[in-house]
Structure formats: structure tokens, C-alpha cells
């Protein structure tokens, strides 16, 4: 069994003293959203880096249910933080550039006022008398903390899981105070499935004889069994099916010997028992109940319309990240957030990161090369502007390719076809070269859609808004006539349902610009006729016949006929010989290797 068998996102976390924690007592009482008042609120927080003279480089990190203020090490002598892979010098959230704040949330058990705090009215811990709190109450406390620190506006708010709920709340409750929002592996409301796991966990705690109505802070028994079971249930939801197979599949009947009284016949049982026992040493059962209930009550709307109405209040740029194997906060739930932001014309980027790690992916190093780079790139452009290096090589990216050559000559013509100061949606935007050109020209509302992760990262590095989506699944997130122009550049030949995709782009755009390789180009005909072989050359046709992404081999004449059959108006056609660098006016179907159409319906 591997040495890391017992390791997880919890590894290294403990109840040790937080040596760098700071404490502030908030001014005035805290009126709670669901009624009641906390008259004395203390917040424990940690900071990293330096606040600059303009006080505009502050990044607030919101932790998840079982987190605390110790997001990262302060020095080599310090204990590990729960997000060292993301926060620190040179890390995606670079503490050499940003002033990072991470407070323990309201209701927590690591110093901020919670159920284990002393109620000034009784002199005893609040325990079950601690009032019901909400994500909004947590964010209100964080807002007052930023007031105390003299920060009017946060460069960004970042958080995963329940931390993502806090990010969503910040963006809608205090829109003028947030420059960028990065909700990770989260949702606008819990699914019934996720809610069910929390209900079982809370029941396990309150039915433990050691719970004693919540007043277990004396020398008597504590609800350790119930809290451990709640945590075991949680850990099941944090792992994906594949992660469990990799961790336990080959050693199912070889459990690790751990000093717990839970079932240990199977390796997964010894793992869960160990995790439950670890958690009991550092967390409070009443806090678990209070915080999980706040998470379960969080709800930005049970319909796309309600969610869009709620998110409409935000003024920030957005980066939404999900993970393909997360079944607790599924990618579909992140996509609901993204779709609501798209519906209200917000600046949003989205990536569903390929991962086998499940919900815990955002806390593990396995995929940080991608989600971490998205965070780094987004933060560097969160206040607007694009990266204008001009050289793709500077970023370690391939230059954009044309049908046959290393330069996208069709982009020059496409840019000329787009009227100034118009909105543009670029489908299959690649690394964002066309969008960057348009942004430089002064277009303020330009959005890309792309499927490839690395291309999305490249776009975010440029400061562009790009949403990960598969064109073959439609453009339902976009409204009728939402954009002045929709561009489908050198993508149509890889589309499965051409009629549906073309119909969709004509619905979303007032004008659509479609470019594609002309498979009737005379050089391709020659290869087929004289050599009897499938045409193969550089650019888009560099693939072998058996591994080509191109599935539609059509010509300029074919597309013109298609437009006629579909009742599509062709406003302009440009035919190019990209090898010669010239426009073709005679027998374009034979002499052009690339065509550009401007169409509408």
C-alpha cells in the first residue's frame, strides 16, 4: 500500500496554535439575516504580503467548511497551510504582488466568534444557543474586517466549495467593493443530494450521546463519534469514483492499521476512520452544525431567471472554475452560474478542468498547473486590459495557424468586416488572437468560446473573457441577437450538426462571419485525383485521414448551396489564396483555399 494512502487535502492540518494569527473585535453589534444579534464579534485572520500605497492589491480568500485562517505558511518554520500550492511567493496568488487576507469565518472554531465562544450574557459557551447564521452574515463580518484594515475595494475575492458561496455573496452583496470574483467548485444553491449528506452528518452528531444538547464543553463526554461519522460522510463526497478506485481498488482487503474503533476490514474503511479521528482533534461539533446549516441555506435562486436577476447586481469580472469529476458541486452547477452571468452580459471566463480528483481537486496539487495558472492569469488582468506582447513565443504558446501557414491571414479580413465599437462572440476562439486584435481596436464587449483547456488559459493570460463550451451542444446560454457579430472561424468543418450550429449562430448574432477551408482547392484535387490519396498538407489539413478532427469536407460551392437551401442571406463572400496572399475573383471554388462569408437570417 502506498505511503500516501492516508494522505488527503486534510493532511498536515491540526489544532496547533496559529502563530501568525491576528485578532480584531468588531465595532458594534452584528444583526443577523435570519434574526437575532451578536453583540460581541471577534475575528481571527491572517495576512500575507504587503498592502501597497494605493491599497488596491488586496485579495480576500474565503475558506470552506472545515478550513481556517491559515491558508499558507508564513515561513519555513511555520506549519503547512491548507492552500500552500496556490498562495505564497511566486504561487498563483503571489504574496510578493498581492496582500492576501484569510479570516476564519463566523461560526468557526479557530478564533472567530462561533458556538464555542463565550456568550457575554451567560459567561458560558454559546453551544446550541448560537443563533442560526448565513453565508451573508459571514460576508458581513468579512466586510467589516476589510473596513478595519482600511481597504475600500478588494482586487479579488477567491474561494472554493462553501468559500465559493462567500465569493458569490460578496459579488452581489457588496458589488462596489469587488474587482474580481473567483468561485471554484461551487454552486448557486446546494443540490438535494449534497443537502442530504449534510442532514445525515448533523443527525450523526446530535444523536451521539456525548452531544448532550450541545453543552459538552466541560469535562464530560463529547460527540466525537457523531462528528467523526459526519466527516467520513464528507470525505466520501470529496473523492471521485476514479480517485477511490486508484486509492483503494488494488488493496481493498489490505487496510492500514489505524488506532480507531470504526470498521477497518476494508482499506477504504481504515482511511475513513483515520480521517474522522483526525477531524475530531481539530474541529468543534457545534461549529460543524452551524456552518453546514449556513451552507445548506444558501440560495441564489432555483431557476435561471432568479439566478440571473441576483447576479445582475455584480460589477466585477468573473473567473468560474469547476472540475470534471466533482459530483458534490458538479460542473453543471458552475455552468448554471456562468449561464446566468452570460445572460446579463457580465465579463466572465469559465473552465471545467479535467481532473480525476473529485471535489477535493481545488485543494490538491494534481491539477494546479491548470487551475492555478487560470487564477494567476486572471488576477494579473482583473482590473481590465489585455496582454499585448504581440509574440506568442513570449508566453510559450504556439502562434495561431491558418489553413496552410503559420499566420491567420483570414483574421485580417475578418477584422475589416466587423464594424467598430460592436460586440463580438468568437466561437472556437483558440488562443484569442482575433479577440485581442478586436480589443486593441477598441471593442469593449468581446467574448470567446473554446473547448481546449490550454487555449482557455492562453486567452485568460491575454486578459480576455472566454467560456469553455462544446459548440456541438448548442449556444443555449446566449440570448437572441445578444451580439452584433458571431464569428465561426475555421471551425465549421469539425462540427457534427452543421444545420443546428449555423442556426444557433444566426440566432445569437445580428451578423455572422464564417470562414472555412475550401476542400475543392485545386491542389487538394490534384492530390486526390493524380495520387489517389486523401489530401494532406500543412495547417488544418496536416492530419492523417484516420485521425483528422475535420469531419465535413465541403467546398465554397457546397456552402453557397447550403445557404440557399436554408434561407440564409449572404451579404458578402471573400475568397483567398493564402499561399499567394491575395483575393481570388475568378473561379473561387477552384482557386481559393479559404473562404469567408458574412451571413444573416
Model region roles, listed by residue range:
Residues 351-391:
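Catalytic active-site module of serine/aspartate enzymes centered on a nucleophile-bearing elbow/loop
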Residues 433, 437-474:
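Class I SAM-dependent methyltransferase SAM/SAH-binding core
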Residues 320-322:
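Short beta-strand/loop motif that positions the catalytic acidic residue
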Amino acid at each position: 500500500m502506498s505511503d500516501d494512502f492516508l494522505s488527503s487535502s486534510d493532511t498536515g492540518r491540526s489544532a496547533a496554535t496559529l502563530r501568525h494569527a491576528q485578532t480584531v473585535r468588531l465595532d458594534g453589534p452584528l444583526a443577523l439575516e435570519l434574526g437575532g444579534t451578536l453583540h460581541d464579534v471577534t475575528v481571527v485572520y491572517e495576512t500575507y504580503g504587503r498592502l501597497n500605497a494605493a491599497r488596491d492589491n488586496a485579495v480576500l480568500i474565503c475558506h470552506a467548511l472545515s478550513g481556517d485562517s491559515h491558508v499558507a505558511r508564513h515561513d519555513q518554520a511555520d506549519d503547512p497551510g491548507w492552500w500552500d500550492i496556490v498562495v505564497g511567493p511566486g504561487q498563483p496568488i503571489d504574496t510578493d504582488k498581492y496582500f492576501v487576507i484569510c479570516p476564519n469565518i463566523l461560526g468557526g472554531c479557530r478564533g472567530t466568534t462561533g458556538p464555542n465562544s463565550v456568550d457575554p450574557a451567560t459567561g458560558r459557551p454559546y453551544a446550541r444557543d448560537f443563533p442560526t447564521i448565513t453565508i451573508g452574515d459571514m460576508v458581513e463580518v468579512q466586510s467589516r474586517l476589510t473596513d478595519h484594515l482600511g481597504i475600500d475595494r478588494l482586487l479579488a475575492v477567491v474561494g472554493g466549495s462553501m468559500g465559493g458561496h462567500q465569493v458569490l455573496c460578496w459579488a452581489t452583496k457588496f458589488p462596489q467593493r469587488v474587482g474580481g470574483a473567483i468561485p471554484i467548485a461551487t454552486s448557486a444553491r446546494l443540490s438535494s443530494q449534497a443537502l442530504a449528506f449534510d442532514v445525515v452528518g448533523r443527525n450523526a452528531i446530535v444523536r451521539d450521546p456525548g452531544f448532550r444538547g450541545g453543552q459538552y464543553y466541560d469535562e464530560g463526554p463529547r460527540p466525537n463519534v457523531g462528528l467523526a461519522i459526519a466527516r467520513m460522510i464528507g470525505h466520501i463526497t470529496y473523492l471521485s469514483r476514479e480517485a477511490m478506485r486508484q486509492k483503494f481498488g488494488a488493496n481493498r482487503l489490505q487496510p492500514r492499521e489505524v488506532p480507531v474503533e470504526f470498521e477497518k476490514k476494508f482499506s477504504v474503511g481504515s482511511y475513513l476512520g483515520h480521517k474522522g479521528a483526525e477531524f475530531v482533534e481539530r474541529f468543534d461539533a457545534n461549529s460543524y452544525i452551524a456552518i453546514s446549516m449556513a451552507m445548506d441555506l444558501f440560495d441564489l435562486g432555483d431557476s435561471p431567471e432568479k439566478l440571473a436577476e441576483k447576479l445582475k447586481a455584480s460589477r466585477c469580472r468573473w473567473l468560474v472554475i469547476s472540475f470534471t469529476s466533482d459530483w458534490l458541486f458538479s460542473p453543471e452547477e458552475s455552468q448554471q452560474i456562468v449561464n446566468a452571468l452570460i445572460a446579463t452580459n457580465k465579463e466572465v471566463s469559465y473552465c471545467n478542468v479535467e481532473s480525476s480528483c473529485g471535489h477535493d481537486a481545488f485543494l490538491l496539487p494534481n491539477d494546479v498547473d491548470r487551475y492555478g495558472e487560470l487564477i494567476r492569469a486572471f488576477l494579473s488582468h482583473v482590473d481590465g486590459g489585455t496582454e499585448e506582447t504581440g509574440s506568442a513565443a513570449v508566453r510559450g504558446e504556439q502562434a495561431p495557424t491558418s489553413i496552410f501557414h503559420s499566420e491567420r491571414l483570414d483574421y485580417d479580413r475578418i477584422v475589416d468586416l466587423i464594424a467598430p465599437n460592436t460586440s463580438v462572440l468568437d466561437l472556437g476562439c483558440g488562443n484569442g488572437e482575433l479577440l485581442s486584435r478586436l480589443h486593441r481596436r477598441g471593442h469593449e464587449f468581446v467574448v470567446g468560446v473554446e473547448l481546449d483547456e490550454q487555449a482557455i488559459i492562453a486567452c485568460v493570460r491575454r486578459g480576455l473573457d472566454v467560456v469553455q463550451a462544446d459548440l456541438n451542444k448548442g449556444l443555449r446560454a446566449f440570448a437572441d441577437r445578444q451580439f452584433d457579430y458571431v464569428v465561426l472561424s475555421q471551425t465549421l468543418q469539425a462540427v457534427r450538426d452543421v444545420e443546428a450550429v449555423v442556426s444557433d449562430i444566426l440566432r445569437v448574432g445580428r451578423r455572422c462571419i464564417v470562414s472555412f477551408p475550401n476542400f475543392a482547392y485545386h491542389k487538394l484535387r490534384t492530390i486526390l485525383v493524380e495520387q489517389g490519396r486523401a489530401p494532406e498538407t500543412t495547417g488544418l489539413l496536416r492530419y492523417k485521414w484516420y485521425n483528422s478532427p475535420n469531419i465535413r469536407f465541403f467546398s465554397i460551392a457546397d456552402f453557397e448551396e447550403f445557404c440557399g437551401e436554408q434561407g440564409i442571406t449572404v451579404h458578402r463572400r471573400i475568397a483567398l489564396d493564402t499561399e499567394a496572399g491575395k483575393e481570388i475573383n475568378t473561379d473561387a471554388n477552384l482557386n481559393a483555399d479559404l473562404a469567408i462569408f458574412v451571413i444573416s437570417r
